[in-house]
């Protein structure tokens, strides 16, 4: 375990004692959000992303150790485990290294080498591989192994069988495979061509009909696109490796300078490479590239999901949600500032001029009746026509504004059992309009009801391993929910189940308890909820807010275990609990007293004390409120209105490997290629922007026919500055 901790510490750039503390906390059953927030002193204040990376690597290394022991036992059972081999197994740090070492001892199907061994030719192969300087001519040596009774008719047959054994031995050699793996990763080229019969067919894979790229320069999105094109029968894919360079690698590992049987062994090495090594290592390299691409796609999805969930809520407004459509009309829902449905309707603005006028009048009446100030417009089918109608309406209704809201996943949610349980009285289509309205009011509370994969901010999410994607995205959702905290008396089961220590069952039990007994008036009261024990309470308590509690600390993110410390801290600075919420001088008084001295007096560490001070100064703080508010609109442009050089403000909708998609209000997102994101080289656009960022862009090119907009952020003035400098700001 100590070796594992040192390795993790080196990989993550953390101190071994901090990594060891995290391992212990995880093994004790603590959740990542709890460790990140309330055990900072023990792990050096790692953030939740680092902690999740650590947990994943820890699991990988433990699985590696388990596989190492399985291999050791298997080889030992064959009585072939030498001290040298055991040391090599212990030194292996990747699964491929372990499997390479195990390969010669792994049970195999019946091969040409197996048959040759059955015919008694293993000693001949061993002599030839021994390469003694005084070794007789191979054919002369093979004459002694000819045995018609065993199927070896001639010396040539014996030599051929020995060659099969040597080829398999070379193929199974860990050093050979390691050298070739390194060569192929550095020098191989991926080539794709149109599959037979597809050469003239138009498809999304045309870019890859004649494509060559060195392996080190392959991008994740290219690998996943090629894999999909091959799977769908559009592409033929090959890996090209310099055969002579590969054979040099093999011979260096096998041949002894000046040794006997050199010509025979050279031929056997060629056979080993062509027949056994190259096909298997090409498959291995393709698999490794796919794994890397999958990890990148999952990482990209998680990077995009976090800022989407953490978009600032638009609180305190009656909001109208519009789910556009053609044949089924535009679905309308009006919700109050708490998200409660006030009214619904269906209008048909695309049917005729008369229906459009009727739709505008219906929306105007609803806005007047309920004093609607904000409109959330879904970005799906018929959104362009609906947006034009909304703009015409807003020219009559001054003071109101609208925002385009991604409706990704809304239809999935509206048809789900959860939506049916929440809105049994409403049609499926109307539920999606409610969801769209609520997404503007509180994106996090609404988006947690939807499978993260359906939110649509990734690339190739349907091609990556579902289990890995689910785990990564669930972690992001959990981190976001706990970073914000939840109101114990208003949170839905969907939100509560994401709180550290809770699950779907305890979340439903909390809601059932408050429906039966009324609002919670203290955090500890949650311990009365069935199936919610002390351990779950410890993990969850700090993330649950109870504004109705007479204990003011229940309104904050201060953990109950630190209540005494918080009161002591207030006393040291001349305050009482009753002063919480009006502590503008607390930081200055603490500085005058001495932070280290105060932390010692309170029996806590400095990181915990800083968190407590932040909560006391702003009880019930929501980190999302500190981020830029979403951009609201009152008018719209058309694609034909765009001209090269125009400078616009837009909202980042998606960040992928090759660029950034930006909504600039023309029904078609524009693309900022990675080379146009900022004034210096970046490896990934996420280094500069995140989903939800409001950015300034300039139009480079407009292709109306293909509905493509090329944008740039380079040298575009923003807020009086000279242009983006690639320094990503906190959102």
Language-model regions, residue ranges each:
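Generic start-of-chain signal for non-secretory N-termini
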Residues: 1-20, 27
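Short flexible coil/turn linkers enriched for glycine and charged/polar residues
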Residues: 15-16, 28-29, 95-96, 109, ...
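Single-stranded RNA-binding regions, centering on S1/OB-family and related RNA-binding modules
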Residues: 546-731
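A glycine-rich phosphate-binding loop feature that marks nucleotide/adenosyl-phosphate handling sites
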Residues: 182-189, 322-326, 380-385, 405-412, ...
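Short, ordered loop/turn segments at secondary-structure junctions
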Residues: 38-40, 129, 242, 324, ...
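Structured, non-catalytic alpha/beta "coupling" segments that mediate domain-domain communication
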Residues: 74, 98-102, 229-242, 252-277, ...
């Amino acid at each position: 375990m100590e070796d594992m901790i040192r390795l993790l510490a080196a990989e993550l750039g953390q101190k071994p004692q901090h990594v060891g503390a995290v391992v212990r906390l995880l093994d004790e059953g603590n959740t990542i959000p709890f460790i990140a927030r309330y055990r900072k002193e023990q792990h050096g204040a790692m953030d939740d992303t680092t902690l999740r990376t650590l947990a994943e690597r820890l699991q990988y290394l433990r699985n590696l150790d388990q596989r190492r022991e399985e291999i050791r036992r298997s080889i030992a059972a064959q009585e072939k485990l030498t001290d040298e081999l055991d040391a090599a197994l212990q030194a292996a740090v990747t699964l491929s290294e372990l499997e390479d070492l195990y390969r010669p001892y792994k049970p195999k199907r019946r091969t040409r080498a197996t048959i040759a061994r059955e015919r008694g030719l293993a000693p001949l192969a061993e002599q030839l591989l021994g390469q003694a300087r005084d070794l007789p001519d191979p054919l002369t040596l093979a004459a002694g192994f000819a045995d018609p009774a065993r199927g070896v008719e001639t010396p040539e047959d014996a030599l051929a069988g020995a060659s099969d054994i040597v080829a398999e031995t070379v193929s199974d050699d860990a050093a050979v495979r390691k050298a070739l793996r390194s060569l192929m990763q550095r020098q191989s080229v991926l080539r794709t061509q149109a599959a037979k019969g597809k050469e003239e067919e138009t498809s999304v894979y045309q870019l890859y009909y004649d494509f060559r790229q060195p392996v080190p320069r392959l991008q994740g999105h290219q690998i996943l696109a090629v894999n999909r094109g091959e799977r769908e029968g559009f592409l033929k894919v090959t890996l090209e490796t310099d055969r002579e360079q590969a054979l040099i690698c093999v011979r260096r590992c096998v041949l002894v300078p000046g040794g006997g049987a050199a010509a025979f062994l050279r031929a056997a090495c060629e056979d080993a490479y062509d027949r056994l090594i190259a096909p298997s290592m090409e498959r291995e390299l393709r698999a490794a590239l796919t794994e890397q691409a999958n990890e990148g796609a999952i990482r990209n999805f998680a990077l995009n999901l976090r800022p989407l969930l953490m978009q600032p809520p638009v609180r305190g407004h009656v909001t109208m949600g519009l789910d556009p459509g053609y044949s089924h009309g535009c679905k309308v829902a009006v919700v109050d500032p708490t998200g409660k449905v006030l009214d619904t309707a269906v209008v048909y603005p695309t049917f005729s001029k008369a229906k459009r006028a009727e739709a505008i009048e219906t929306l105007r009446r609803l806005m007047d009746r309920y004093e609607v100030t904000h409109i959330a417009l879904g970005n799906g089918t018929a959104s362009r026509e609906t947006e034009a109608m909304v703009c015409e309406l807003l020219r009559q209704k001054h003071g109101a504004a609208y925002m385009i809201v991604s409706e990704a996943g809304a239809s999935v949610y509206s048809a789900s059992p959860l939506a049916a349980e929440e809105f049994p009285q409403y049609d499926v289509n109307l539920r999606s309009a409610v969801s769209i309205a609520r997404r503007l009011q509180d994106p996090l509370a609404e988006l947690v009801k939807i499978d993260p994969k359906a939110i649509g901010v990734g690339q190739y999410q349907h091609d990556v391993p579902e289990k890995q994607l689910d785990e990564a995205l669930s972690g992001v959702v959990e981190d976001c929910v706990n970073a914000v905290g939840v109101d114990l008396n208003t949170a839905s089961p969907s939100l509560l189940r994401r709180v550290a220590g809770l699950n779907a069952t305890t979340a439903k039990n909390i809601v059932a308890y408050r429906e039966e007994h009324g609002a919670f008036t203290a955090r500890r009261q949650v311990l009365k909820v069935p199936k919610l024990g002390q351990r779950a309470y410890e993990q969850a308590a700090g993330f649950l807010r109870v504004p109705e509690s007479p204990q003011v600390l229940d309104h904050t993110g201060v953990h109950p275990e630190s209540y005494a410390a918080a009161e002591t801290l207030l006393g040291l600075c001349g305050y009482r609990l009753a002063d919480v919420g009006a502590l503008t001088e607390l930081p200055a008084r603490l500085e005058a007293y001495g932070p280290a001295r105060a932390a010692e007096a309170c029996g806590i560490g400095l990181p915990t004390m800083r968190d407590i001070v932040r909560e006391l100064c702003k009880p019930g703080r929501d980190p999302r409120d500190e981020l830029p508010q979403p951009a609201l609109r009152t008018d719209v442009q058309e694609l034909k209105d765009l001209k090269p050089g125009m400078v616009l403000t837009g909202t980042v909708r998606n960040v992928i490997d090759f660029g950034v998609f930006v909504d600039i209000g023309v029904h078609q997102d524009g693309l900022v290629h990675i080379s146009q994101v900022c004034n210096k080289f970046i490896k990934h656009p996420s280094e500069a922007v995140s989903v939800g960022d409001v950015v300034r862009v300039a139009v480079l090119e407009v292709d109306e026919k293909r509905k493509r907009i090329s944008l740039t952020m380079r040298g575009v003035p923003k807020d009086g500055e000279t242009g983006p400098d690639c320094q990503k700001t906190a959102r």
